[in-house]
Amino acid sequence: MVSMRDLLECGVHFGHQTRRWNPKMKKFIFGERKGIYVIDLQKTLRYFRYTYNIVRDAAAEGKTILFVGTKKQAGGAIKEYAEKCGMPYVNHRWLGGMMTNFGTIRQSIRKLEVIEKMEEDGSIKLLTKKEALMLTRKKEKLLAYLGGIRYMKTQPDMIFVIDTVKEKIAVQEANRLRIPVVAPLDTNCDPDLVTYPIPGNDDAIRSVQLFCQEMAEAINEGKALREQDGEALANEEKEITDEEKKEVLDEAMSEEDFGEEQE
């Protein structure tokens, strides 16, 4: 579990410039130095350890925790640590409705499965070069936006977010659905929007990595406890039909921009 030394070495205590702050974060601020707010690491440590246990217990109950972080400093760590603990993630861009309109998102994921099946069974080779190219492009878009959540069959039970200001739509959707939000809170964030806050820097790469690493460790610890009960989850594959193949091909040939359509 995280230590005070970890927090200091990763710069978790460095907040934003004093002119860029949310007054609601005042209780988490230790002081100010050279125009930068300094976060109270004693409180960070306490909240960190409490939240670690919350996430561990959620994983032990078999719950799904969705990792969300799309900015440059977070994307790599979000993907790396979500995969290390076997959880879904969004690290490219949050598409509006990813949780509140999950049925439509699942339909798009199904299209990805259809294209991959066509590649696997060779039916894509029966198409013209242009048709095959358009399907390949569509697959790349689908993978970029939805690859991290392709195995998420239902809405998540909890979300872990890096930068709640940037990911405000994801946080809003979670709040609307009463899905608990876990997130580091920099000095410009609104703590009222987060169920389990951890005051700390959400911009520095090392700080972001530390948060992601600790959440992944908590989840793996919880999963280990669950495995003691001998429970296993089975993923059932749904057969791809010719009708689905034709539908996805027609859609790809229309040259629709998936990202803009879903935004």
From Swiss-Prot:
The keyword Ribonucleoprotein applies. Residues 223-263 are annotated as: Disordered. SUPFAM superfamilies: Ribosomal protein S2. InterPro entries: Ribosomal_uS2, Ribosomal_uS2_bac/mit/plastid, Ribosomal_uS2_CS, Ribosomal_uS2_flav_dom_sf. The keyword Glycoprotein does not apply. GO terms for cellular component: cytosolic small ribosomal subunit. Residues 250-263 have a biased composition (Acidic residues). It comes from the Bacteria. One of its GO terms (biological process) is translation. Residues 223-249 have a biased composition (Basic and acidic residues). Keywords: Ribonucleoprotein, Ribosomal protein. One of its GO terms (molecular function) is structural constituent of ribosome. HAMAP family: Ribosomal_uS2_B. Belongs to the universal ribosomal protein uS2 family. PANTHER family: 30S RIBOSOMAL PROTEIN S2 PROKARYOTIC AND ORGANELLAR, SMALL RIBOSOMAL SUBUNIT PROTEIN US2M. This is Small ribosomal subunit protein uS2.
